[in-house]
């Protein structure tokens, strides 16, 4: 069985580095969530994209989801209801996650990351007109899912903290604020902001760094490992009991293996592209003035080998894998642990 072969190879590597939960999207059958848990002790956070990449509404494809549309609302509520019913009794399910930085999807379509619009008025207008209905619908879905399954927490996945004031007003029933966040070595004031605005736990649903140095135009494993370790240090220091924001409950490192599909999405899928798609000043080690430095296809803490006839490939851990293996051994809740760990 090709699925079992793929899982056994990857879950073994994940277990070895101390991973205790992975993020999977809907479409994975409950039996595989159970298989991963029973054989490797790894839980699943199950993620419904909630229209992030478009929807088929009344038989027609809609590329950019309009959360104000009644038919769209009905469709997403029915999918959320089915999600809770289908997975509520699955061994190994840890929690549900709704969306994937859907607030960014209000500005651009598709999964390919772009630079963000600078116009504050435009952002605020889109937040009110299109974002507020989306967040309200996410909260409605949360209420419905909790009426079916009261055993699993429900989080949303936001892009950074954009529109957090609207979230505070519209998402009063979510359990956890999930965020995809790329700020460099530190998450700066994120934990404090979430504590002040929402006062619920924060979970990093995506964070990390690529392993390609845009200045040197070459792989740079040390650079990637540095950002990974610094990010985890920040998460740990904001865990409960350590005297800072005390609201961080963990995170999902992005990503386990390189995504060769990320640049271009539908072309050159057999090429490991080194194009830098966007610029981020937080990652200063390979930032040149006026140049992009975020290499979407190089975020894996494992590199991919060639694909065999079964469609499988060998993974080759990078330095970040081993750095994270050490970092994962720390339990911030253990007696005697201090912020200076």
Predicted features and spans:
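Active-site mouth of glycoside hydrolases
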Residues: 1-177, 186-187, 195-198
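A structural motif corresponding to the C-terminal end of an alpha-helix
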Residues: 16-18, 86-92, 140-152, 234-248, ...
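Active-site clefts of carbohydrate-active enzymes
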Residues: 55-65, 107-117, 198-238, 248-267
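Amphipathic alpha-helical segments in well-structured domains
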Residues: 73-80, 138, 191, 221-232, ...
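Short, glycine-/Ser/Thr-/acidic-enriched flexible segments
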Residues: 183-184, 209
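Aromatic-rich peripheral "rim/lid" segments of glycoside hydrolase catalytic domains that contact
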Residues: 254-341
């Amino acid at each position: 069985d090709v699925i079992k072969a793929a899982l056994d190879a990857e879950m073994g590597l994940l277990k070895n580095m101390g991973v205790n939960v992975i993020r999977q999207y809907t479409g994975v059958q409950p039996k595989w969530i159970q298989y991963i848990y029973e054989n490797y002790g790894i839980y699943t956070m199950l993620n419904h994209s909630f229209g992030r990449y478009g929807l088929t509404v009344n038989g027609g494809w809609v590329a950019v989801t309009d959360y104000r549309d009644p038919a769209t609302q009905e469709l997403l509520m029915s999918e959320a209801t089915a999600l809770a019913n289908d997975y509520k009794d699955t061994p190994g399910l840890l929690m549900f996650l709704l969306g994937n930085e859907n607030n960014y999807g209000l500005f651009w379509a598709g999964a390919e990351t772009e630079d963000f619009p600078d116009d504050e008025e435009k952002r605020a207008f889109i937040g009110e007109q299109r974002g507020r209905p989306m967040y309200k619908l996410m909260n409605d879905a949360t209420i419905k899912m909790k009426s079916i399954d009261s055993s699993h927490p429900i989080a949303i996945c936001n892009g950074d903290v954009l529109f957090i004031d609207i979230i505070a007003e519209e998402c009063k029933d979510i359990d956890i604020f999930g965020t995809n966040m790329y700020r460099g070595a530190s998450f700066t004031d994120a934990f404090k902001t979430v504590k002040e605005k929402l006062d619920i736990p924060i979970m990093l649903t995506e964070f990390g760094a690529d392993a390609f140095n845009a200045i040197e135009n070459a792989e740079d494993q040390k650079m990637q490992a540095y950002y990974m370790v610094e990010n985890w240090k920040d998460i740990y220091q904001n865990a409960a009991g350590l005297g800072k924001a005390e609201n961080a409950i963990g995170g999902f490192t992005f990503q386990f293996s390189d995504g060769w599909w990320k640049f271009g999405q539908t072309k050159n899928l057999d090429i490991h592209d080194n194009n830098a798609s966007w610029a981020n000043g937080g990652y200063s080690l390979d930032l040149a003035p006026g140049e992009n430095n975020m290499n979407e296809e190089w975020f894996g803490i494992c590199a991919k080998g060639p694909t065999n006839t079964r469609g499988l490939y060998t993974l080759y851990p990078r330095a970040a894998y081993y750095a994270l293996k050490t970092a994962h051994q720390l339990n911030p809740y253990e007696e005697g642990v201090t912020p200076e760990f």
